Structure formats: structure tokens, C-alpha cells
């Protein structure tokens, strides 16, 4: 399996490159970065202290032509542009980017008609196991429990709430026969009045180098249940993304991490 990495100079890009280099059965075929990046022209492993023989390039088409699958943790506009070229070249895409609009996410199905696409707001195996626990809890605690979701990330994250937090909200809503759009409350300030029954509240924390913390609270009278996942490094995201890339071998269609993990 030949893998290309988008955003090669970023924190996640570097973790992905390192993970590909350490994973049997896969090779680093291309390392891609934006035009003007200091990394362009350097060995993809230079910042890791490893010589890979793969030079970082801003020529997306040439880079993708050497790969079977692209792993993309960049920004929505960049990812959509990458998808267009990947479709032309028949290259599968693993999308870890978050912050897409509902319309942009809906377009992934069109790409899946031609190439294999895995999109998930979080590639971590542990997070996806947490999703299952939340689904079970939401069904059991559908009556008499208020739901609040609290997430925390590093100060550089540009979207809020996180894609993972939104996915958690969707899971709760769907497990209880509703939609997140009907129930979500994204901000509270000033005199808000009593909490509205049936809402799903979100709280966002941004600071320092927090990799990613997510907690779903089911709060009843006299008790509360908290389901928490904490990421100590981006390694789990990278390993899940490489696993997803391997899953796409020979496949067309739109998939998520449930498909990759067989959940």
C-alpha cells in the first residue's frame, strides 16, 4: 500500500509520516504541502531525524499519481480540492479534516461513487469504542437525564465544537430517535433561563497543547454518568488513519471508522 500524506509539515502530518514509516506493509509514496511552505524541497523525514528519500512537494497531481491512498488532515477547502484530483487519478482518500459544512460532507458520497473514501471526525480506535458506549448509554438514559458535552483542545484548533464532539451529539440524538439539529445548544451567556428539557448542550475549551478531551455527561436527579475519552498524543489518530488507508485497498464507496473497525 503506497500512501501520500497531505499537510506533511504540520503536527499531524509529521505523526502520520512517522507512523507510515513504522507500519509493515505500507510505504510513504509522497509528502505534500502547501506552496510556500519551508518544508517543500526537504526530505519528508527531516524534522523527525529520519531520511525517507521522499521529498516534500507542492505538486499535488504528481505526488498523488505515485500513491494508492491519500491521508488528509488539513482544512476543508484544501481537502475538497485534493478530493477532486484524487478522483481524477483513482486514488482513495482518508479524510481526518474537520470543520466541514453539512453540504460539504454530503458531497463525500459523490466521490465515493468513483473512489474509496473514509471520513471520520476521529480516527482513534479508542474514540470509536467510546462512541459505542455513548450510544448504549443514550438509549438507557433517554428519560430523565440531561445531556451535556464538554470538549477541550489546543489553542491552535480553528473549529468549535470539535468534529468529535458533534459526532457524539449526533449519536445521542439518533439513539433517542431525534436529530442533533433539533436539540443542540452551542452557547450560553447571560440570563438564559432554566435549562430546556431535551436539549444537548456543548461547552468548548481551548488552551495550551491539549490534544483532545471529550466528556459526555448524562445528568439525572441525584446522579450523573460521565463517559470520557482523553488523547495524550496524536499517535492514536495516526494509527487509525493508516489502518483506514489499508482498509480502502481495492474498494470504492464512502466509509467510516465503524466500517474500518468492523463495529
Curated annotation (Swiss-Prot):
Binding site for NADP(+): 34
Chief location bin: cytoplasm
Protein family: Belongs to the DapB family.
Lineage: Bacteria, Pseudomonadati, Pseudomonadota, Betaproteobacteria, Burkholderiales
EC number: 1.17.1.8
Name assigned to this protein: 4-hydroxy-tetrahydrodipicolinate reductase
One GO-annotated biological process of the protein: diaminopimelate biosynthetic process
TM helices/strands, residue ranges: none
Keywords (A to Z) from UniProt: Amino-acid biosynthesis, Cytoplasm, Diaminopimelate biosynthesis, Lysine biosynthesis, NAD, NADP, Oxidoreductase
Sites where the protein binds NAD(+): 7-12, 33, 96-98, 120-123
Catalytic activity: (S)-2,3,4,5-tetrahydrodipicolinate + NAD(+) + H2O = (2S,4S)-4-hydroxy-2,3,4,5-tetrahydrodipicolinate + NADH + H(+); (S)-2,3,4,5-tetrahydrodipicolinate + NADP(+) + H2O = (2S,4S)-4-hydroxy-2,3,4,5-tetrahydrodipicolinate + NADPH + H(+)
Organism: Ralstonia nicotianae (strain ATCC BAA-1114 / GMI1000)
One Gene Ontology CC term in the entry: cytosol
